[in-house]
Design a protein with these regions (language model features):
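Acidic, surface-exposed loops and disordered segments
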Residues: 1-244
Length: 244
């Protein structure tokens, strides 16, 4: 079974003292997935309506392939209703929040978010043990690094199996009652903390894209983020002398 393959791949991730601080909760029940979908939808509407999301992440929004090629990072908003296209740069700006609300963009995004989460056959709850995940101690950072590697193992294995993975971030962005509702759904014991939620499902190449959607395939060249010996000393590619 593919789920077993994904979880076993996570188990092979390195962790400090082989502590394996992660735990995973599989949510497959239709009613529970739909409940989480509603939480995701309401969270999306809340965050987008207030506009804080745009202020925080606007620097990563790109509106053309040329912008993506130049920046090498961010997300390219490349799918939206034609009626919105003339206003796109204004809408996705700090000043455009009011117009965005008038055009009901947060509601469009909320409906799409609800559908995406509800229709995903598997939701993965990711937890860390509080015995190791202590935010004011080194073990807290070690635990997060270990968990990141475990999730990466899952992601790579999923990709090889034709399974898509997406982080369900909006309930956490909205915080408060929205994130608490997710915690209540997962029901972690006192000594475990819910850290993240992901949705998984087999990729359908013919599936209709969300009403407003983006792509993020662009990457910076290695020379832009790698340095030699000290930060700022540009690394020169094609020098493998240290491996000979």
């Amino acid at each position: 079974e593919h789920i077993k393959i994904l979880l076993e791949s996570a188990s092979y991730a390195p962790s400090h003292f082989n502590s394996q601080p992660w735990r995973f909760v599989l949510i497959r029940d239709k009613a529970r997935r739909e409940h989480l979908g509603r939480i995701a939808g309401y969270s999306m509407r809340e965050v987008m309506t207030k506009g804080n999301f745009w202020k925080r992440y606007l620097k990563y929004f790109r509106f053309s392939k040329e912008e993506m090629d130049k920046a090498g990072d961010g997300i390219h908003i490349d799918n939206m209703p034609s009626v919105l296209k003339p206003f796109i740069k204004y809408l996705f700006s700090e000043k455009g929040v009011e117009m965005m609300n008038k055009l009901r963009v947060p509601y469009i995004l909320a409906i799409d978010s609800k559908k995406l989460v509800s229709r995903s056959p598997l939701i993965l709850g990711v937890l860390l043990t509080k015995d190791e995940y202590k935010k004011d101690e080194h073990s807290g950072m070690y635990s997060l690094l270990s968990l990141g590697m475990a999730i990466e193992n899952i992601w790579l294995s999923a990709t090889a199996l034709g399974i898509g993975v997406q982080f369900i971030s909006l309930p956490m962005e909205a915080g408060g009652a929205y994130w608490q509702a997710c915690i209540d759904l997962v029901q972690p014991p006192e000594n475990y903390e819910l850290v993240a939620l992901f949705r998984l499902g087999y990729i359908d190449p013919n599936a209709k894209r969300p009403t407003i959607d983006w792509s993020s395939t662009q990457r910076k060249p290695v020379s832009e983020f790698c340095y030699e010996e000290t930060f700022g000393n540009k690394w020169i590619p094609n020098c493998d002398c240290y491996f000979t």
